[in-house]
Amino acid sequence: MPAIRHLSGLDNGFDQPILVFGASMGAMHAANLFFRRPDIFDSVFAISGIYDSDIYFPGYMDDVLYRNTPCTYIPNMPADHPYIRQYNDRKMLFVVGQGAWEDELLASTRRLQSVLESKGIHARFEYWGHDVDHDWPWWYKMVETYLPQFID
């Protein structure tokens, strides 16, 4: 990350904000990177992600899984954790459809929204229609709709 910040500074005259973005499994990775390092990443844009581990590992938890499952570690953050302020100073957008192959992702996104709200973390959640499937054509439309909002 230091090299990216340095090179962007050389090309632009100042450090550029760094957005983490992903769809499907990439959304989970983007969200996890952002939540674990809000000091590095300025924003997160996650589409159709799963943010808890129960879907893949029902009833199982170890330290590695815990540290990589936002719906598990965020509830245990103290109310005065400095990351909470940092989260609220940054842009967060989570988008999911409600069509084919989105059921588990929709439920996980709603759980993440509930977790964040319970901690006073102000993220934006967008729920697209029941015709919006877990597939690239829809993700392209979501990117076209929302990515410009991250570019200042």
Question: Predicted segments — roles?
Answer:
Residues 1-152:
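Non-catalytic cap/lid and distal C-terminal segments of serine-dependent acyl enzymes
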